[in-house]
Amino acid sequence: MEELSGKPLSYAEKEKLKEKLAFLKKEYSRTLARLQRAKRAEKAKNSKKAIEDGVPQPEASSQLSHSESINKGFPCDTLQSNHLDEETGENISQILDVEPQSFNCKQGKEVLHTPRAGDIQGQLLHSTSSPDGKKEQNTLPGTTKTPWEKSSVSQEKEDYFDTNSLALLGKHRKGQESISRKNSRTPVSEKTHLLSLRSQIPDPPALVTGIGEGILIPPSGKSERGIDTLVRGNTVSAEAAVPSCTASNSNHSQHLEHTPPKSGCKITTQGPASSTNLVAQDQKMTIFTVNSVVYKAVRAHGQLPGSPNSCSVNDLTHSNLPANSTPNSKSLKSPSNTVDERNEPLQEDEILGPSKNFNLAAVSPPSTESQIHSCTMLEGLLFPAEYYVRTTRRMSDCQRKIALEAVIQSHLGVKKKELKKKTKATKAVVLSSEDTDQSESGMLDTSTGQSSSGSLSQKLLSPAEVSSPPGPAGKATTPPPGRGHRGKRKSARTSTLGHCQLLFPPCAALAVNRSKGKFTKHKCQNRGVVIHDFELPDEDFGLLKLEKLKSCSEKLIESPDSKNCGERLPREGNHAALEELQRDSETEGLEEELTVPPGEAYRPGPTLRRQPGSKDLSSSIVLFTPADTAAPNDSGRPPPSLCSPAFPILGMTPALGSQAAGETLSTEAAQPCSTSQPPLLGDTNSLVNNSKQCNSSACSPKPDTNLQASGRQGQPACDSDSGPQATPLPVESFTFRENQLCGNACLELHEHSTEQTETADRPACDNLNPGNLQLVSELKNPSSSCSVDVSAMWWERAGAKEPCIVTACEDVVSLWKPLNSLQWEKVHTWHFTEVPVLQIVPVPDVYNLICVALGSLEIREIRALLCSSGDDSEKQVLLKSGDIKAMLGLTKRRLVSSTGTFCNQQIQIMTFADDGSSKDEQLLMPPDETVLTFAEVQGTQEALLGTTTVNSIVIWNLKTGQLLKKMHIDDSYQASVCHGAYSEKGLLFVVVSQPCAKESQALGSPVFQLLVINPKTAQSVGVLLCSLPQGQAGRFLEGDVKDHVAAAVLTSGTIAIWDLLLGHCTALLPPVSDQSWSLVKWSGTDSHLLAGQKDGNIFIYRYF
């Protein structure tokens, strides 16, 4: 523990650590060398066998000639399975040939006769040719363990079953051949091993050993692997053992019959999906040959349910899959891999669809030899170096190249691009959103598991079959029907959208690596294998473990009633909803009810409404919170990190519905200003949690007073006898649609009281709630002209930067500096005599520079206002002139502007130097539509968003100037003004205002709207509509958005504030002294709200 305390190491200790690290690297090198030697030896052996087996064998030829007539009608007698060796690029094939003995014709049918039951041997002989021409036979693993069986345990390769490995008829064969050619990656050479059921041993079948359990040994070296298949043909049924051995094919008018004196086997084949069932002494061995994939299942005392469209077994121990699968889905078996009835589930390799060439990344348990139990602590490493060594060894099954140095350097925090490229983690399977732009890509279907286009070559794994290794990332399993499994498992639920496109990016539990074109899926590891993890002694590392667990638990915020939110089956239909993993419990909705005591002053209710989505989307689509967003602290109020580009934190969006869908919520004793506990991905937590109570007393307008006092019922409220009143709004009349979140919604309100807030001249309490407005100070307008704009910026004077207020009237712009918390002093003034001032353009990261827009009705000039460093005199610099349609100040001291229309449009970015002069200009690619507004995308660097006159949203790359995407949004958002854009998990969250929106009885008076756009598919949906509270009149006049709060001036002269996290109006600021509000802006230096009146007076409020 000396190393953990930060004690510097001596030179000898450093040398010793270097030697130990070198030793650890050597251990890895040796492990890799052994693995490579084994692969090379096996490759050489297989190559030699392939050359020798390339000569046609006369016995095989005679057998084929004898059974030519049957092979014509029964194409599945020769069973072949291919697997691709990634190391050598060779395609190794295995052929299972059922050799008939004699044929007699009876009534037009061909009959096979064999002398006795022992002819059909359960032994699958591995026939190869030795250098001297003799044949070698490898029998059951109980008698001989061959070298290829031993090496199969440590092999790190993926098995591929070529879909062209069996002879198919008609279109199936042509389709499979074409798909196989598309999916072939490298030229391969074939190694063929003939497996025949020889009739050379007249003894009873050697298949029955021990307690009546048989083993099929595939000759590919994978003797301990089970093989799954896709059942695309007819049903394969297994019946009880009868003293006969029969093979029938009704489709091809063939009948194979064998009746030995002591038979215990029955072979049944139905339709093109042929199978071979061997039943001997109350045990069963089945070989399925379904569309070129060999299925092996060995189990005792079991039967296959014979339904027309399924092939499954009773025993689904390791994946809990449903008992019946769909035609294009698979059944997972748990074959035995020993003779003593251990029945352990093995890892399985599967082909899940020819169109995407799926494969399984095999994960084998780590080797337990050469265990290093010492503890070597290095400065900067959280755990001993041996921990990372053993972790890397366990990861070696998923990585093609081990880089111990990369693992250690990554934990030390050293970022090296070349090391990052080498490390490819394949533990989690992630469905990339890149496939959403393909109109013919297969969608995950909960009913059939096949693509909506219906093509046989486009099939995907159904959600009932998705499983991942257990771990902190969660599981994706589906319990069998009729049984409800509750616990820590999570369910992955999917549904389809229109034409195979997703609105929301998929969760991190599934992934398609498009560059490789393969879909990988992890299965549960063998339960019989014990994985020995590196254990840290508790006596030495107990405190470190506790700190690590504590830091991890703080990141996972769980709602107190998360047990009420749980697993629900998705609705049937064509709705796009890819929901994240959710907890297994039932959601019952909202039953709480709060009451308003009589005698309280009128307070308008919240107006959170869910606008129906676009024409292609259903209103049942629910937006969940991105995983990377910030979470509130324990006090329930938003932390300062919420006022950051990480936006938005949204729970389930309540929709407009009837009273039957949800209970009406009222307020109790006060005005609750609710804060949202943002649900993590996969949690269907409440939209509003830990709501806090605060009330406001009616008071006469007078500055420098607290606008709101909060307290419990019965406690004296703070006297607020002056100042413009800011009315916080209660959470009232939340309604939900029945179809929201598949018919269930969860909303919990928890009441907490807050301490009484202080007045303006006292420090505020720490537990202040959102929705409070506190008047700080007031600026009196000395000029007679009306105020047109106000802003806050940093101004540097005498080497010190201080926040200043900039006020703009029609003919003068003034800069105010603070004298104290309540008084301001005018420092600089710029006068304009020719062209009036229209607005102030704040530019972030720029000091001692003010940008203003001049013009009568349209912007004609952009000027920079600054002061000379010598005499401190004011001066003006013309930056741009012309028909300016839009402009915006960007980070890194940049200003973007758009001039002209259509073909003559020019979009230019101007960069300012430290002294305020323009030093660089850049042109952006103009769209074919006139740009009206700009918005910088928070959360994504170098991204700019703009809105056009024809209701489109365009995105630029600021670094290259390229126009990335143009997306048309719904026509219901006509003449929308973009106020902010945020990016999370590949989605765009855009806040727009609708000045021309009409008031409706259903939606009220809409002011702000939150749109979610998928740039990949150009689909958009409105998820949040901020409307005026009930009883408030007017329409949107002017507004501003900062982080998660939005403020707007209404035509009635009132200022309303919405919290986008809560989704409802939190405060109202009525007119003061019969002077209506004319403008409102959020301060860029702090959380102050700047409100201006028509007479030019500016009021500064603190919002918390």
UniProtKB/Swiss-Prot annotation:
Residues 446-462 have a biased composition (Low complexity). GO terms for cellular component: DNA repair complex; nuclear speck. Residues 1-195 are annotated as: Interaction with RAD51. Residues 1-308 are annotated as: Interaction with BRCA1. It is found in: Nucleus. Keywords: Coiled coil, DNA damage, DNA recombination, DNA repair, DNA-binding, Nucleus, Phosphoprotein, Repeat, Tumor suppressor, WD repeat. The modification Phosphoserine is found at S274, S364, S432. GO terms for biological process: animal organ morphogenesis; apoptotic process; double-strand break repair via homologous recombination; embryonic organ development; in utero embryonic development; inner cell mass cell proliferation; mesoderm development; multicellular organism growth. Residues 39-52 have a biased composition (Basic and acidic residues). InterPro entries: PALB2, PALB2_WD40, WD40/YVTN_repeat-like_dom_sf, WD40_repeat_dom_sf. Residues 693-1104 are annotated as: Required for interaction with POLH and POLH DNA synthesis stimulation. Residues 9-48 form a coiled coil. Residues 1-157 are annotated as: Required for its oligomerization and is important for its focal concentration at DNA damage sites. Residues 771-1104 are annotated as: Interaction with RAD51 and BRCA2. This is Partner and localizer of BRCA2. The lineage of its organism: Eukaryota, Metazoa, Chordata, Craniata, Vertebrata.
